[in-house]
Regions:
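Beta-sheet entry/capping signal
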Residues: 1, 73-77, 109, 162-168
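N-proximal low-complexity "stem/linker" segments adjacent to membrane-targeting elements
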Residues: 1-82
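Short catalytic/ligand-binding loop motif for oxyanion handling, primarily in non-cytosolic enzymes
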Residues: 9-11, 84-88, 177
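Intrinsically disordered, low-complexity regions
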Residues: 45, 49-52, 71-74, 84-87, ...
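P-loop NTPase catalytic cores that bind/hydrolyze ATP
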Residues: 53, 148-152, 170
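Active-site-proximal specificity loops/subdomain of glycosyltransferases
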Residues: 86-164
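Short beta-strand-to-loop acidic/aromatic patch adjacent to the donor-nucleotide binding site
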Residues: 158-177
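Acidic donor-diphosphate engagement hotspot in glycosyltransferases and nucleotidyltransferases
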Residues: 179-181
Length: 181
C-alpha cells in the first residue's frame, strides 16, 4: 500500500522520483486503505522494510533448525496497491529500490505485482474478456486484492514452479517470533 508523500518537499523522497511525483500534488485520491506507506516515509516507519526484514530473520531461525536447505529461499509475492491511479510505476520503482538498497534478504525472493502487471496477466490469459479485471488486481476494494493473491498460487504453479503446493497471506506489519514459536 503506497501513497503520495505527506510532504512534497521532504528529503526522504528518492531523487529519482521527485519530479515524477509532483503531478500527484493536484490529483484526487482514488483508493483508500487503512495504512498506506507515504513515499516520503522514514525507513524505520516503512512496513515493507520492517516486514521483509523480520520475515527474513524468522526464516533464518528456520534455516538453523534445519527447515530450510542451504541457498533455499521462499518466493514472496508482494501485491503493490496504490492510492492514486497512475502512481503504479512510481510505487514499483520506489519499492524495488528500497528493497535493493536497504535489505539483504537471504531467505526471500520478492516478486512485486502492481495493477499494471496484474492487468497484463489478465489480458494475456483472457484477451477477449476484460470482465476479469473487475475481479483480479491489487488496487481498490479488498476483494480484487484477495482474489489476486488467492489465484497467484495457481498461476505460479502453472507458469513458474510446479512444485509449489501451498501459500499463505500475511500483512507486512505482522512478524513471527520464531524463538518463541
Amino acid at each position: 500500500l503506497i501513497t503520495i508523500p505527506e510532504d512534497y518537499k521532504s528529503n526522504n523522497i528518492p531523487l529519482n522520483l521527485q519530479s515524477r511525483i509532483k503531478p500527484f500534488l493536484s490529483k484526487n485520491q482514488n483508493y483508500w486503505y487503512d495504512h498506506p506507506i507515504p513515499i516520503d516515509a522514514f525507513d524505520h516507519e516503512n512496513e515493507i522494510l520492517y516486514g521483509l526484514r523480520h520475515l527474513d530473520k524468522a526464516l533464518s531461525i528456520e534455516f538453523k533448525r534445519g527447515n530450510l536447505k542451504i541457498n533455499e529461499k521462499i518466493s514472496l509475492i508482494l501485491s503493490l496497491s496504490v492510492t492514486h491511479i497512475g502512481l503504479e510505476e512510481i510505487a514499483f520503482d520506489y519499492v524495488k529500490n528500497k528493497i535493493r538498497e536497504k535489505l539483504n534478504l537471504k531467505f526471500i525472493d520478492v516478486f512485486v505485482f502492481d495493477e499494471n502487471r496484474t492487468s497484463k496477466i489478465i489480458n494475456t490469459l483472457f484477451p477477449k474478456n476484460n470482465d476479469y479485471e473487475a475481479l483480479f488486481g491489487v488496487n481498490g476494494n479488498y476483494g480484487r486484492h484477495y482474489t489476486f493473491l488467492k489465484y497467484a498460487l495457481i498461476l505460479w504453479n502453472k507458469v513458474i514452479n510446479k512444485s509449489f503446493k501451498y501459500s499463505f497471506k500475511i500483512d507486512l506489519d505482522q512478524v513471527f517470533d520464531q524463538n518463541f514459536l
